[in-house]
Amino acid sequence: MTKHLKKKRKNLLLYVATMVAGCLAIILFTYQKFQSPVIKAGQAVEKKYSAMPVPTLYIHGWHGNERSTDQLIESAENEKGAKKVLKVKVSPQGATTYLGKWNSDVKHPLIQVVFENNEAEIPDEAGWLKTITEELRQRYGISRINIVSHSMGGPVTLFWALNLRDKNSPRLQKFVPIAGPFDGVIFTDDVPNQNRIKENGEPVWKNAAYQSYYEKRDDFPRGVSVLNIYGNLEDGTNSDYLVTNASARSLRWLIKDRVEYYDEKMIKGPMAQHSKLHENKQVDRLVNDFLFD
């Protein structure tokens, strides 16, 4: 009898121990179920954030249109495996229309920006650029962008970066202005060989717009890599016909203390004419290598 009771007691203790172990396992499983996903979700979001591709926006200049950036985009597609995923058209009233489909699986997504009013003032186009960047973030979660601009698209990008960009804006990672008139335009407020760049990079003559940029220079985002491309017809004007080399190169003095990397490339000869620069294969290669290599 005693032997029988001992056996029952042993079985009871074993049963209790098994139940306790089971309860502990359930508690531990439940805890992990509700706690672990918080960490994993955070890790997944971080991975997704870091893996999100960086789209490149192409912005035309004064009197420009989609043809102004077609060759640049096609060359990126053919040479670097990039793909145009969106075209954003902006009405004269600032309303945006998105054509195409965003695809986060594309390694080098390209976005073509077209202003239907291609004679709008710089602040207006910069405001439209702000709208686009905000919508890209809200719609697709885009947190970083590159910008390639031709002509007035350069000052438009600069105005946005200095005056309209905020902490919620996508971070400007790379900027490639082509033929950017940052300190005057020939036939408007500049004359060939009137201005020059000092050894320290400062332009001798500064127009009103440039002075306003200079006052806001500390608002240019840090860490941007810049490739500034400009043309020289080699006809004695030191210009691309519309933009003097001094006007284009004056950008450096504005942002030199803010950027992570800055370089300039002069294109020479007949194909360095202002409107031909965006049809120039040398320019295509420079832009593509800078953006995608």
Residues of each region from the PLM?
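Lipid deacylating catalytic domains
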Residues: K10-V16, G22-V148, M152-D293
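Short, low-complexity Pro/Thr/Gly
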Residues: K3, M19-V20
